């Protein structure tokens, strides 16, 4: 996986709640022009759970087409880490095969939510999906969402026994997990899935981030990651601290509710629309977002 900085993309909707494809393409191009290495369509932040199978595939397709046709500032191509998560292994497998067929660089697969599988069930789930494709696979551990954690022993077993399982997105909130995973397998790539811990994870064995805040501030997320990769601890910490209040504000309600409203307030999407059961943020949250964006001089 030849990338380090990436954003978990929001999925913009029109007022009728259909996917706003033009806005989606524009957001991806902004990621490219502001220095991100990769984009992650249709993950948690992309509201994948409320997209139809057809919409899910179309979002992956748009991301791949846009990255293929738009060069980065270094005249290269931004990578696409396609979200293929589902609580049905068969659906994830289908999405994984589709993503590979149309040119995704790698896939991100979340643990099945609601089902609460055993560790053996998780192992078989990930193994089955990974063995159906040849491109790299990133595990995604986010127990607050799924109700089940990929135990360290299970993650290590998957890495050791399934050749194309190369990485894990760590959104457990546990630095202890990160340090333990890195201690046991230095080549197992760890990506931060928790913006408030980006700096800490990068200096505890992590090699990159998948950021929500990066939707709004891709340049600063990219700069922080690049500083960390060069072992410029203090410079990376200064950027992390600079983003502290924004990271906090974007998670006062369930993700992606605040980030979509923030993107709207910043003029980056026309409609801050959500599909039920997600709803618009409270007045208090909107006021907090407005105040925070003013502090960062995103809005006047």
From Swiss-Prot:
GO BP: diaminopimelate biosynthetic process; lysine biosynthetic process via diaminopimelate
Location of the protein in the cell: Cytoplasm
Keyword tags: Amino-acid biosynthesis, Cytoplasm, Diaminopimelate biosynthesis, Lyase, Lysine biosynthesis, Schiff base
One Gene Ontology cellular component: cytosol
Pathway in which this enzyme or protein is active: Amino-acid biosynthesis; L-lysine biosynthesis via DAP pathway; (S)-tetrahydrodipicolinate from L-aspartate: step 3/4
Catalytic activity as recorded in UniProt: L-aspartate 4-semialdehyde + pyruvate = (2S,4S)-4-hydroxy-2,3,4,5-tetrahydrodipicolinate + H2O + H(+)
A matching Pfam family: DHDPS
NCBIfam families given in the database record: dapA (TIGR00674)
Subunit field text: Homotetramer; dimer of dimers.
Name of this protein: 4-hydroxy-tetrahydrodipicolinate synthase
Organism, as annotated: Helicobacter pylori (strain G27)
Lineage, uppermost ranks: Bacteria, Pseudomonadati, Campylobacterota, Epsilonproteobacteria, Campylobacterales
């Amino acid at each position: 996986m030849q990338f380090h900085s990436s954003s978990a993309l929001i999925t913009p909707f029109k007022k009728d709640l259909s996917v706003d494809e033009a806005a989606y393409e524009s957001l991806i191009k902004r990621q490219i022009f502001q220095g991100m290495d990769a984009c992650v369509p249709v993950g948690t932040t992309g509201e994948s759970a409320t997209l139809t199978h057809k919409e899910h595939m179309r979002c992956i397709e748009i991301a791949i087409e846009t990255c293929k046709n738009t060069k980065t500032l270094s005249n290269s191509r931004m990578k696409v880490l396609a979200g293929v998560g589902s609580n049905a292994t068969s659906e994830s497998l289908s999405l994984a095969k589709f993503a590979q067929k149309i040119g995704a660089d790698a896939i991100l697969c979340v643990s099945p939510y609601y089902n609460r599988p055993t560790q053996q069930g998780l192992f078989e789930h990930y193994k089955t999906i990974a063995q159906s494709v040849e491109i790299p696979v990133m595990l995604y551990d986010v127990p607050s969402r799924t109700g089940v954690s990929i135990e360290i022993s299970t993650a290590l077993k998957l890495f050791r026994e399934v050749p194309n399982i190369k990485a894990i997105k760590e959104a457990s909130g546990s630095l202890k997990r990160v340090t333990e995973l890195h201690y046991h397998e230095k080549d197992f790539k760890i990506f931060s899935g928790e913006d408030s811990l980006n700096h800490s994870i990068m200096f505890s064995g992590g090699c990159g981030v998948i950021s929500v805040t990066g939707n709004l501030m891709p340049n600063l997320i990219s700069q922080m990651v690049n500083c960390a990769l060069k072992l410029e601890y203090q410079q990376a910490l200064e950027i992390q601290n600079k983003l502290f209040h924004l990271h906090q504000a974007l998670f006062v309600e369930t993700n992606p509710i605040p980030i979509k409203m923030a993107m709207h307030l910043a003029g980056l999407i026309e409609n801050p629309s959500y599909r039920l059961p997600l709803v618009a943020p409270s007045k208090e949250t909107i006021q907090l977002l407005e105040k925070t964006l003013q502090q960062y001089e995103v809005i006047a």
